[in-house]
C-alpha cells in the first residue's frame, strides 16, 4: 500500500526507494531495473516518478511511463510489453517497449 504512494522527482528517486526498502525490509535487487532511470536526470526536464499509474496495466511487464508537457498535457505513454505477443498466441516470447504519442498535444 505504501509503495503506491511513492511520488518524487527523478533526482530524489534513489533516496526515496532506499528509504522504502529499508522501512519495509526488502531486498535492494527488487528495484535494480529502476537504477537505469538515473541517467534520465541529466535531461533538462522535470521528470516525476510515481508508482501509482491509475490505469489498467495488466499487459505491461515492467516500467510504465507517461510524458507530459510543461502545460500538463499528455504527450506520450507506454511501457514494457515482455510476453504480450505470446499471450496473444505467438509461438515466440518477444521482449518489447512501446509508446503512443498524442500528436494533438505536440507543439511544432
Question: What positions do the PLM features span?
Answer:
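Positively charged, Gly/Ser-enriched RNA/tRNA-binding surfaces
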Residues: 1-108
